[in-house]
Amino acid sequence: MTARIDAAFARCRAEGRAALVTYVMAGDPDPETSLKVLEALPKAGADIVEFGLPFTDPMADGPAIQAAGLRALKAGQDLRGTLALVRRFREGDDRTPVVLMGYYNPIHTYGVPRFLEDAQAAGIDGLIVVDLPPEEDEELCLPAREKGLAFIRLATPTTDAARLPAVLANTAGFVYYVSITGVTGTATPDFGRVSQAVGRIAAQTDLPVVVGFGVRTGAHAAEIARGADGVVVGSALVDALARSLEPGDRAGSGTVEAVAALVRELSEGVRSTVKTGA
């Protein structure tokens, strides 16, 4: 299923621009609203969607995404329900790539073979599992690749030249460069250093390199888009959703539009920038 991911990047390259990759938490604030948000993302300009798996101990996530996960869990969202949402999304959209992003525990509990079968059937294109290092590829990465699912790795500012080959081994779809140290949504990246890091990674792989963590505005997205193959935005979208909620974490009449409006701004930022070398 990496074909959808490859096709998305090919379309962006043909337009001379970076891809916009948007992250939202599955089931936030409730499953039905979450599906409407998921459906709104491509229409507002997202090229690829990352769909977060709610988990009780999200060690790499900042306050915004932690809160989103708690809202989703409170609403009864689990891995089975997340796959069901993607199946429903696929009824109306067979083009936009969907990448599940989360932690290994829910997948392990579900059962890896059953998860991979169900993910493939639901129309999942790839996985980002932040707490499975390359040394544990046999747990999920290699079985996922056998099923045609992209296993996408994170590289960070602390990933040195000795470590990078291990990070890139068995990676498919794209490489996700984390632009800051720390948790999501807590700082603004140094755009100059990010560009240098992207160049260093790109010299070692033919895969697209996308950049996330700390990207919150259309202007941020435009800066990253100059040198990266894709721009990932998550915490800012989750924040926009949270601000739209009614008391009791209930969806408001403007919840879906609050997210879509920011995606349109981010999309304009990405599309306003001609990618370096394009």
UniProtKB/Swiss-Prot annotation:
It holds the Pfam family Trp_syntA. The active site is at residues 50, 61. Tetramer of two alpha and two beta chains. Coiled coil: none annotated. InterPro entries: Aldolase_TIM, RibuloseP-bd_barrel, Trp_synthase_suA. Disulfide bonds: none annotated. The alpha subunit is responsible for the aldol cleavage of indoleglycerol phosphate to indole and glyceraldehyde 3-phosphate. PANTHER family: TRYPTOPHAN SYNTHASE ALPHA CHAIN, CHLOROPLASTIC, TRYPTOPHAN SYNTHASE, ALPHA CHAIN. The keyword Amino-acid biosynthesis applies. Its EC number is 4.2.1.20. The gene is trpA. Pathway: Amino-acid biosynthesis; L-tryptophan biosynthesis; L-tryptophan from chorismate: step 5/5. This is Tryptophan synthase alpha chain. Keywords: Amino-acid biosynthesis, Aromatic amino acid biosynthesis, Lyase, Tryptophan biosynthesis. SUPFAM superfamilies: Ribulose-phoshate binding barrel (SSF51366). It catalyses: (1S,2R)-1-C-(indol-3-yl)glycerol 3-phosphate + L-serine = D-glyceraldehyde 3-phosphate + L-tryptophan + H2O. GO terms for cellular component: cytosol. Belongs to the TrpA family.
